[in-house]
């Protein structure tokens, strides 16, 4: 409702962010989205990995997937809809993108073994996330279709200039704060 605001940062659940992003975008506002709603350019991949139809697929191609360290300032300044990457994708894309873009590593057979504490697995309540279950025990999860896989493959494919398939193995590890 406030017309004096130019930039909106959305920190909403996947699916909900789109409902707010569309009218803001249409009103000419800059939208920075922290959810996964605009991270993928394909509505088919969004449905495959998030289990629902994308609420406004017409905006997917208009969103700029942005890791500041890999983006030019003009891209950041000129973007009206910014999709912020997920945690695992940030940790994978940031080092691999420039290496693939410059042809410094082979693009075939990329294997990514990533680990996070249980807080990296989301907010759902699960017995497997409590300390006594995780302590001294690392476990892989979300294989072979972790929802960040499509995001990683899409961005690394752009860097390599061809379609890539990577092996992404996320793990929950016992990490104390």
Regions found by a protein language model. Give the residues of each.
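Oxyanion-binding "anion nests"
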Residues: 142-177
